[in-house]
Amino acid sequence: MENYNTKPLSIVLASAFYDEQIKQGEKIAKELGIDKIALGKLIIDYLGRLCSSLIKDIGVDRLSGVFLSGGDTALAIVKHLGFETLEVVGEIEPGLPLLKVANTELKFATKAGGFGDEWTLIRVLYRLIS
């Protein structure tokens, strides 16, 4: 495995990329007696722990930014990182704020689902690395 501490990188983590994966997860949860709300909370908490662990391992000072889609997931990641406040420092596009962690240069962009176009992610990445 390559050492990601020595190379620039982009990492994408998602709970599911396709609708079929969501349905499969819901089916397994139902078989285990877990309802959709509890399943969602488990996934959000797990992603929060995983992302915060990865960010800490890479080093906050080595990252130019973090893009988070989904408000609950973003909140879980920020909580697990132990950050108290995020400051709004700009807007990438309507409804998509650019945030900065107090006392660091780390930037976050958070996007709720259901809006944006095929260029939204490109604009986000550009703002995070610039």
Give short role names for the model-derived ranges:
Residues 1-130:
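Active-site catalytic microenvironments in core metabolic enzymes, especially phosphate/sugar-handling
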